[in-house]
Amino acid sequence: MKKAVILVSGGADSATVLAIMREQGYEIHAISFNYGQRNNAELRKVTELVKEYNVKQHKIVNIDLRAFGGSALTDDDIKVPHYHDTKELPEDVPVTYVPARNTIFLSYALGFAEIIGAKDIFIGVHTSDSANYPDCRPEYIKSFEAMANLATNIGGVTIHTPLINMTKDQIIKTGLRLGVDYKNTISCYDPSEDDLSCGTCLACTIRLDAFKKNNVQDPINYILF
């Protein structure tokens, strides 16, 4: 069985990629990050999520990105914006962007992959992300892959982005087809202390809209509903 590494949070995108990897027959090795994020409820969800997909091993890496701040997810002085409708969502880079986060995460994943002899790395970036986050764009992924093959001894590394051309509603549709239980995920940037999603941050707004477009009720609990 071919080994592969996945960058996994406790979100809907990660769950969908896990299901795709399982369908494709990979031996899955997962890596997650406790980087001081405001939404660390995802770490509690991801522990349960990886059990569903018979992940061979799951590493949680501690990194203190709060030392730099610069994002609403890593700096308590920057508030998470809330919205009433998808029409209100920002068109430029939002304050929830964590500078260089995917570069940091992919670098760790690359090291992990080389150590276990895996040449395939999966990440759940997609169309809805690439419009706002510079490190989710196809050209970024292509450039990182080129760097990875220059920087490692193993060579032949492929960065897989199975969701890259999908909108959020297409991702949910794919996951539902593959039997993903989205009840065990959380996407919220600003969850309550008891891990309820706010329902109005950028991530919640996009997620709720995606389920609505699929005529399916989002199975998780929200503060407002």
Curated annotation (Swiss-Prot):
It comes from the Bacteria. Keywords: ATP-binding, Ligase, Metal-binding, Nucleotide-binding, Queuosine biosynthesis, Zinc. Zn(2+) binds at residues 188, 198, 201, 204. It holds the Pfam family QueC. Its EC number is 6.3.4.20. Pathway: Purine metabolism; 7-cyano-7-deazaguanine biosynthesis. GO terms for molecular function: ATP binding; ligase activity, forming carbon-nitrogen bonds; zinc ion binding. One of its GO terms (biological process) is queuosine biosynthetic process. The keyword ATP-binding applies. It catalyses: 7-carboxy-7-deazaguanine + NH4(+) + ATP = 7-cyano-7-deazaguanine + ADP + phosphate + H2O + H(+). Binds 1 zinc ion per subunit. ATP binds at residues 8-18. The keyword Ribonucleoprotein does not apply. Catalyzes the ATP-dependent conversion of 7-carboxy-7-deazaguanine (CDG) to 7-cyano-7-deazaguanine (preQ(0)). Belongs to the QueC family. HAMAP family: QueC (MF_01633). This is 7-cyano-7-deazaguanine synthase.
